[in-house]
Amino acid sequence: MTEVLWISWGIRLFKSLTLEPAIVLHTRSYKETSLIVESFTRNYGRVSFVAKGAKRPKSKIGVIKTPSCLFLISCRGKGDLKTLTHCEINTYFDPSSENFNSLVYLNELLIKLLEKEDPHPEIFDHYLKVCNFLKHLGKKDLGTHLRFFELNLLKEIGYGLDLKFEANSNNEIKEQNRYAFDPIIGFQLLKDSSDKKNCYKGKDIINFSKGDLTNPDALLASKQIMREAIDFHLGNKSIKIREY
């Protein structure tokens, strides 16, 4: 249950959230005993709130500090920064130590690419799907899931990639050709690829479009393509976890 305030130009401000599915993207200390939490909720997008007293040993909302979980949260407040009134753990993701940085990476993407209080339930559900694999998948298989999460994320926020057609053309991408990638217009046919560092085989692009990254070359190409696209849309922001 959610109380909502409406203002004249159609922007929705949340007065309260009740038992809303949420993941914690980031926390930072606030005063001596509290936390400011950046969360991603299923139905209301990124929501920031204060968890008052969460650092106290016997705090009822101290569970919000538990990493790698799906929570149910309740909070109130009219402004951008709500106040947490209740939280409980719904699911532990329990990522392996090898895959923990992948979870941090996903959280950074959501913080830096999503607007506040802009709902994206499909992204939320896809995030949970990837998190369910963090405990047992190896690096290669997890990489496949990360690439499709990135692809879906860009699509949902309006920056989808065309993996089927050449840029500014109705010509389909062909296996035997090579292409340069431009994050704005897409894949451009290369007549001579000898002077291009970042050129991609048509075969690898087609496999990516079909959801088939079993070939190591296609998996590597998909990683490079998505990094180029994401870095472009991040602008002057950066993904800190890549530095480690």
Regions found by a protein language model. Give the residues of each.
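Non-catalytic alpha-helical scaffolds and adjoining flexible linkers that form interface surfaces
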Residues: 3-35, 40-244
